[in-house]
Design a protein with these regions (language model features):
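Polyanion-engaging groove/track-forming segments
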Residues: 1-222
Length: 222
């Protein structure tokens, strides 16, 4: 029992046969565990934040001027996005989803989306404004990361892992910006998406800890 064995974990290791189990294990560790060493990397593509940017690329690659309602619901419900719509204890994301369902909306224009929540129009703009150029896409993604970070910083100690995710994705988009400035072949959103995926699949999130102290978490090959 990890809760009871706080002072006797120096010789304890958790061995994971599947790297995808790492994040669920970290999220379920008792709060009393204050020393931890993780010796396995975690693929950046498997981090929850990756699914958000994949959804954004997919909706903006379509040429339609409106969005399918399920795509809108999935994005505003994303665990990294939904907290941005909390206002004075009110879940504005839920209110938007209710409007969509109550009015049986199938396709939703950008203007109508912005009308759902005037106080959150800056966030809606980051998510749903037209991605006209590669430069504007990269700027939007960087601003979105910063906006999410500002929200998480309000309770930093409880969001250390999520903030680490954001840092790594910020590095990734900075690298994309560097490649876009250095080379001239990234002309379309589809090309940018391909380069993004190539970088994403080559990166891992590496953790640091004290190798001689606390609970050890490792993969089968460690």
């Amino acid at each position: 029992n990890l809760k009871k064995e706080r002072n006797n974990l120096d010789n304890t290791a958790v061995v994971l046969g599947d790297e995808s189990l790492l994040i669920p294990v970290l999220n379920s560790l008792p709060e009393n565990i204050d020393a931890l060493n993780i010796t396995m990397g975690f693929p950046l593509k498997s981090i929850p934040l990756a699914s958000l940017f994949e959804q954004l690329f997919q909706i903006h690659k379509k040429t339609s001027s409106s969005f399918y309602y399920k795509d809108v619901v999935n994005i505003v419900s994303h665990p990294f996005i939904r907290p941005l719509f909390y206002e004075s204890g009110i879940d504005k994301a839920s209110e938007m989803i209710d409007i969509i369902h109550e009015n049986n909306l199938i396709y939703i224009s950008r203007d109508r989306l912005k009308g759902f929540s005037k106080t959150n129009d800056n966030i809606l703009a980051l998510l749903f404004d037209d991605w006209n150029t590669v430069d504007s896409i990269l700027e939007n993604c960087s601003q979105l990361i910063l906006t999410i970070k500002n929200g998480l910083d309000k309770n930093k100690t409880s969001n250390l892992l999520s903030l680490e995710y954001l840092f790594r994705f910020n590095v990734l988009f900075n690298e994309l910006s560097h490649l876009n400035s250095k080379y001239s072949h990234i002309k379309t959103i589809s090309t940018l998406h391909d380069v993004y995926k190539e970088l994403l699949h080559s990166e891992t999130l590496d953790f640091q800890g004290e190798p001689l102290q606390g609970l050890q978490i490792m993969g089968m090959l460690e």
